[in-house]
A protein has these predicted regions:
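Partner-binding and oligomerization surfaces adjacent to conserved cores of proteins
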Residues: 1-267
Length: 267
């Protein structure tokens, strides 16, 4: 487990307009499985089967070693990890130009600031590390000829698989909460024909709601009232371009100012 002293005091999660509305109305976090992510390397570990190696190397000459390719079981491992590990992601950066553009839909969404102490009560917060393009992906020998998800060693490896990403993702400065999909903290919600994994957000865990630069005043008021139902001490902010540098800044906004701006814009 990540050393708690090294975890920043605040963690952030970016949302699109529909995503933040749903999150605040239901007061829930969405959990993902590796197979649902947009990164093809998600949990795509190079695991090799000891029994398969023994079987294939018998009688092989060095020039025939090309036939050992079948010992790696990447896709099978990726699917298997989805059975033992679900995760939800956070960032340590609330002023990322890229994440505000992408995850917050060009500043029309919002970013939630979470209290790390409330988040860490799950006891499974881990830091993501990033590999350089030329780095070899780690190889993991399986303890058995088949994938046994109940093995403690395998579950430990599954968490390692989920916390290593390519260097292109470095800008996310990511931490992940990782839990088994069948954890008592996680529930299921039907959306259309599919089921998604969710968990309740502890009361008071949301310490600030940061509005995107392009969020209308009326929407700010609506989101502010939603979040205060379960997080009455939540503060508010608005992200904006710095006047002199190529960076974003977060300006604090009192709730009274949000409501006053709304009444002025409606007159």
């Amino acid at each position: 487990m990540e050393n708690k002293d090294e975890v920043p005091s605040k963690l952030y999660k970016y949302y699109s307009p529909s995503g933040i509305t749903k999150t605040l109305l239901t007061n829930t976090l969405r959990w993902m499985l590796p197979c649902e992510e947009n990164d093809p390397f998600e949990a795509l570990a190079k695991c090799w089967d000891k029994e398969a190696v023994k079987e294939k190397v018998q009688g092989l000459r060095p020039k025939d070693w090309v036939f050992l390719e079948g010992i790696f079981r990447e896709k099978e491992v990726q699917e298997s990890v989805s059975h033992v590990a679900a995760f939800t992601s956070f960032s340590t950066n609330d002023k990322s130009i890229l994440m505000w553009a992408h995850y917050a839909a060009n500043h029309t969404g919002a970013c939630i600031e979470f209290d790390k102490h409330q988040i860490q009560r799950f006891n499974c917060l881990k830091k993501v590390t990033y590999a350089n393009p030329g780095d070899e992906r780690e190889e993991y020998p399986l303890l058995h000829g088949n994938l046994r998800e109940e093995d403690e060693e395998y579950q430990k490896h599954a968490e390692e698989f989920l916390c290593k990403k390519a260097t292109e993702w470095t800008y996310e400065h990511e931490y992940r909460l990782i839990l088994p999909p069948m954890s008592k903290y996680i529930g299921y919600q039907k959306v259309g024909e599919e089921f998604i994994l969710i968990s309740g957000i502890p009361r008071g865990a949301i310490t600030k709601l940061i509005f995107g630069y392009n969020v209308p005043v009326s929407t700010r008021v609506a989101w502010a009232k939603m979040v205060q139902r379960n997080h009455p001490d939540c503060k508010f902010g608005k992200v904006a371009p710095d006047k002199t540098k190529y960076e974003l800044k977060v300006e604090d906004i009192p709730m009274e100012a949000i409501e006053n701006t709304s009444s002025q814009s409606s007159t």
